[in-house]
Amino acid sequence: MLKTSNYFLIKVISVEVNRGVYTIKKNLSVLEGCKYLGLVIPRFCYHEMLSVAGNCRMCLVEVVMGSLAQKPVVSCAMPFLSNMKILLDTPLLQKARANVVEMLLLYHPLDCPVCDQAGECDLQDQTKIYGVKFSRHFFHKRGVENKNSGPIVKTIMSRCIHCTRCVRFNQEILGTEVLGTINRGVMTEISSYDLQPLLSELSGNIVDLCPVGALTLKPYAFKTRPWELKISESIDLTDSLGSNIFIHYKNLEIFRVLPKINKNLNATLISDKARFFYDSLLHNRLIEPLKVGKPCSTESMLFEILKAVQSKKKLLILCNSEISLEVLFLLKLLTYHYSNLKIKSVVTEFQQKNFYSGLVGSVNSIVTNSKVCLLFSLNLQVESVLLNYKLRKKFLHESLEIHSFLNFFNTNNFSTFINLNAKNFQFLLKGKNRFFGQLIKETNGLSLIIGEETLYKRGIQALSITQLFKSINFKTQPLIIGNTCNSAGAKLSNLKCFTKNDVLMARNVFCLNLMSSNVSLRRLLETPMLIKFWFNTHYSALALKANFSSPLASDYMTSGIFLNCETRPQLSSQIFLRDKVTTSLDDLLKFLLSVKPEKSLFPFLEKEKSIILEPSLFENKKIFNFTCTNFATDLKKVSLYPLKVISYDHYLSTKQCENSKILINCSLELRKKCNQQF
């Protein structure tokens, strides 16, 4: 009991709020503490992710401290003190809040019927609760010129209330000082320096922060109202982190994608690629089955598929790491049914061999426990935007050193760039470098993040990451950042990379959803092969080499389980019903499995999701049967060329993103900005 009382004396203080006594943590502001107690204090400028500004004066509370006079203070900047008395709803506060709302409405246009923020506007809600029912303004309203903010954000600056959330978001989270306030007094306005567009990997989140309709989404403008939309939960399938999202749709059309709060992954943010990925499903789509470029029926295509599978000729199925765990599981079962069938991946052999179960870290553990972070062949600002944001937040609020082993590139994190080749990096991790040898020995919070994109480079294949990392005492497990949404699941399924000999020996080649990256596409185009069946959602250069092309159901028409970079299983939910023309990989593979009743495993297939999600499978590797081998011992085979970054463009990092007009426009604006700087 003594320890418990001492704990509360140190960590907790007693305060009085609205004549009720509460115990609350130290070092909390009055606004944060009241929110923790479930008491509502109105605000406009305060946000949990940003620093305190105190611009709006809407969060006023009355404070009584001992014998001092009772006075109103700003609750977002006032910390809780012991024996403090706080009043939240006095006549003085009601009048002050009404005056603040009236002042904000003096120059605010009355265009709520045409505003995209209507129904979700903080100014509307707080005017109804705290505002007055009459107007004393008899002058003309001020007009402010709209700024060109790029292809994502639409500005109507006459609605701006100068909360400066967007300014602080750009400076503190994005690391760019594009926005700021100009002029003074009544003529104050938010503007961008040199009229630069808002271009960042997280710039779409500014719209979510804006409490009024000054900043809205350009693709969403004048399309629908928020109360007309249905909402479904899902995950981001554009990177390996798997951010949680809300999908807003009406009928058969997706109108916008918003972040879902998940403190372990994406917090309250999502990348622009995740926000506008749905636009790629509207362009360059396969809409009907094709036979040598001409339309054909689905039944005839299924007959040809069944005929090819049942023949004794060798078949090759090529897939990538963007398909779900259920499809990978069914592909494994298909090989047990048909001995003439081989399943290969387009992922390089290096990635498969260097992955093992122990090399799986956690994003939260790396961010919280690391004091020195090593980035190997990784551009976080392109390949994992949200992890880059978390490391930047750690750097700004605590001590964190970031060392990037790659050539120099623009980043919003303060990093030390060390341009080494794979051989020198191997010597460095062994402690043969004076500076880093001492750093590895003395640093308690040492963490490592490995990129997957630049590991395609020829010559790094002999670098055994496994053996190197076993000798280093990392504070957390190293983390591999993949390129696709199920890159960890593809590694655990132990699919081997295809070779040129596999393609030449196969009679028919099946291609399943092959649009992962430009590297894999180039390798397939250079391979002399005849593709028999092409299954995908979009056209591609490989589709021209296929005899049969079948449209696949989009990611929003199917559900599936995906493993993110932490090997965390997450469910992508189905939003729309699949039409009669498109094909689902689940249904296609189950159809092929059902034609052999003597080996029917449908009682087993009905439990496939529970089997895949069983934690013991990932711990013991019962089905996947993954083994780690040491294959790199000869330093002569290691490349002597320095590592170079491959992914420079966040918006077009995958082939599917190249079909989105919104992301293409973002990429063009980014290239224009880079050309102007140099």
Functional labels for PLM-detected ranges:
Residues 1-10:
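N-terminal mitochondrial targeting presequence
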Residues 46, 332, 368, 381-389, ...:
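A cross-kingdom feature strongest in bacterial/archaeal respiratory oxidoreductases
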Residues 57-236, 241-245, 253:
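Fe-S ferredoxin-like electron-transfer domains
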Residues 110-139, 576-623:
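N-terminal leader/propeptide and maturation segments of large enzyme subunits in energy/redox metabolism
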Residues 138, 248-313, 368-372, 381-384, ...:
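Cofactor-/ligand-binding subdomain signature composed of acidic, glycine-rich
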Residues 202-259, 368-400, 405, 515, ...:
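Phosphate/diphosphate-binding loops
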Residues 301-305, 399-402, 406-505, 599, ...:
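Active-site phosphate/pyrophosphate-binding segments
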Residues 318-366, 465-495:
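Anionic-ligand anchoring segments at beta-strand to alpha-helix junctions in alpha/beta enzyme folds, i.e.
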